[in-house]
Amino acid sequence: RYLFSGVENFLFYDLWQDGYVNENVFAYSNGAGDERVLVFYNNKYDQAHGWIKLSDPYAVKTGNGDEIIQKTRTLSEGLNLTAEDDKYCIFQEHKSQKWFIRKSKDICEQGLFVMLNGFEYQIFMNIQQVTDTEDNRYKILCEFLNGAGCDDLETALQELIYKDLYKTFVPYAKSALKAIDDSK
């Protein structure tokens, strides 16, 4: 609840769909400390899709009397992401519990694409930026998943790394299962 209730890190975004702002989609980020959440809600029956990148303007006091200026922040600023080549953003979708990975640089430069069915919501939690390993594990996993989610990032990575080893056991497993089945 604390991730949703504060105002210090709250940013509201427009969803850009086919060159226009989709007024039916509510998109915002918020957080506390280093923790961030990203929320989407489609308030219409029709499917919505598009990109978010820049927050809507918000008022900031300048400290010069009653003077106020309008500011915006990027999604990457709202999520504490940097555009370094070896940085990746991992996050978990609340409803499905699936984990996702994206290049932080892509989010910084392009924003984030979202697709929502009518009256659907998505809440991304556990958002964090990680640095790739020397053996490029996050890069390999990001390219392999290609935008799809998985139940567990570490398990998906292990399955990817050891897929050739697993393939060598398939004939033995089939043979063992057949032997068990034949003995019944």
Each predicted region: which residue ranges?
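Carbohydrate-interacting/catalytic domains
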Residues: R1-K184
